[in-house]
Amino acid sequence: MASSGQPKVVLLDIEGTVCPISFVKDVLFPYALSALPATLEAQWDKPEFSQYRDAFPAEHASSQEALTAHVKDLMSRDVKIAYLKSLQGYLWESGYKSGELKAPLFDDVAPKFVQWKKAGEEIMIYSSGSVAAQKLLFKHTNGHPADLIPEISDFFDTVNAGPKQEASSYQTILAAHPEFPEANSWLFLSDNVKEVEAAKQAGMQSFVVERPGNAELSAEDREKHRVIKTFAEI
């Protein structure tokens, strides 16, 4: 473990850290797009859907066609904006519940969750995906146990914490848990070097996770940060 000692809290990214980036890009995103037209047709005027529709800018929520076009544009550019993330979570929910969607965790993830929890360490999640989408993913995995929600203490996204590449977001997360006041008792794991740097600026320990399919790390990245290939190295 790092010189600061065993962490009390392990804060985890999702894409490229606990599951392949390809799951989001090649499975979840296409599923949302394919489910969108029928969902809008069936739910457009229903009260339970209005919170998702009305969160969009007015010009894009004026019709089903306008909203669909805006969603396609945002997703083609991988824009991480809260109202899109909320709608995606809503669209994915039926797929997870039907069993059509199941999160393919890396083999070391579920066993390590159980190990961390038994050791008294808290597990928390910080992802650009909405908290609702995070909970769906961890409730429906290919791991053992398949439902990892009981192992997780809290969830953060860009709404309740802020942008993932800003140190202030990690300070917000720290402030949400005054029972763990020492920043260096937190360990943040992510495939994104800029996120790791932001967490370190906030005082957390942070490692870069190198998984199959992730972006190539530079020699400078490897020199500046501890890089792990599996949670078993922690």
Swiss-Prot record:
Compartment list: Cytoplasm; Nucleus
Q: In which pathway does it act?
A: Amino-acid biosynthesis; L-methionine biosynthesis via salvage pathway; L-methionine from S-methyl-5-thio-alpha-D-ribose 1-phosphate: step 3/6; Amino-acid biosynthesis; L-methionine biosynthesis via salvage pathway; L-methionine from S-methyl-5-thio-alpha-D-ribose 1-phosphate: step 4/6
What does the cofactor section's free text say about binding? Binds 1 Mg(2+) ion per subunit.
Q: Where does Mg(2+) bind?
A: 13, 15, 191
- Disulfide links within the chain: none
Enzyme superclass (EC): hydrolase
List GO BP terms, alphabetically: L-methionine salvage from methylthioadenosine
Naming one, the record's GO cellular component terms include: cytoplasm
Q: Which cofactor does it need?
A: Mg(2+)
Reactions the enzyme catalyzes: 5-methylsulfanyl-2,3-dioxopentyl phosphate + H2O = 1,2-dihydroxy-5-(methylsulfanyl)pent-1-en-3-one + phosphate
Alphabetical UniProt keywords: Amino-acid biosynthesis, Cytoplasm, Hydrolase, Magnesium, Metal-binding, Methionine biosynthesis, Nucleus
GO MF assignments = acireductone synthase activity; magnesium ion binding
Briefly state the protein's biological role. Answer: Bifunctional enzyme that catalyzes the enolization of 2,3-diketo-5-methylthiopentyl-1-phosphate (DK-MTP-1-P) into the intermediate 2-hydroxy-3-keto-5-methylthiopentenyl-1-phosphate (HK-MTPenyl-1-P), which is then dephosphorylated to form the acireductone 1,2-dihydroxy-3-keto-5-methylthiopentene (DHK-MTPene).
- Family listed: Belongs to the HAD-like hydrolase superfamily. MasA/MtnC family.
- The name this protein carries in UniProt is Enolase-phosphatase E1
Give the species. Answer: Podospora anserina (strain S / ATCC MYA-4624 / DSM 980 / FGSC 10383)
